[in-house]
Amino acid sequence: MQRNERFSHQWQRLKTDLLFKEDLRDLTRIQDIGQVELLAQLLAKQTGQLVDYTSLANKIKVSSPTIQRWIKALSNLYFCFTLQPWSKNIAKSLIKQPKIYLWDWTMVKDVGARNENFIASHLLKAIQFWTDAGFGTYQLHFLRDTAKREVDFLVTQNQEPWFLVECKTSDQGISPSLYYFQQQTKASFAFQVSMQKPFVDRTCFIEGKPLLVPAQTLLSQLV
């Protein structure tokens, strides 16, 4: 166990070194590699949170547009990805703050944030596969309103809400926000996934009401 953990740490360090000392330097015009590395460290601590460009800019002593440009560069190099809030008004949704996640969810230290990032990564891979395979156009968003009700993920199919996913570490009762947003979006399915709940052999995409399901069960039915 200790040997595997040590190997994991060594691999992460090597991968990070390659990203910042070679890929970022060679594939972009960014000169301040040290500051971008600091940004990456801050993003790893803020996974699953709204991106506050101004706050990040103040911490790193650069402009907000520079932070946005650097995050885009890190996204292009598959270090992180952002999710936009869903809105029927597409222009309006693009103005709002996105959420940030890492492609390598093992770099996230906080357990709850790491679990949410784990689900986000698998959902993103699934929608990319479905779209590339010609099943339709799929996108991944999150939901949040002015009353601060929130659901972690919304998958859309051809621009229409398809299913919601709320991620919980423990086996808890279904979040009221999941019921609320399913009613508001008219999504066909809604799931609250439990990371601790053991796998059960059941089909998730049948019942229309919100379901409490093991993460393993839902993820096994995506691709």
Report residues per predicted region.
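Arginine/glycine-rich "motif VI" loop of SF2 helicases in the C-terminal RecA-like domain
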Residues: 129-133, 180-188
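Hydrophobic/aromatic beta-strand patches that form the interior of the parallel beta-sheet core
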Residues: 101, 141, 165, 189-193
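Active-site-adjacent loop/helix micro-motif of nuclease/hydrolase catalytic cores
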Residues: 170-179
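Domain-level recognition of nuclease-like catalytic cores that cleave nucleotide substrates
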Residues: 197-223
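Conserved beta-strand termini and adjacent loop/short-helix elements that scaffold enzyme active sites
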Residues: 83, 143-145, 193-195, 215-216
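Accessory nucleic acid-recognition modules appended to NTPase machines
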Residues: 3-161
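Short glycine-/acidic-enriched loop or helix-start segments at secondary-structure transitions
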Residues: 152, 175-176, 202-203
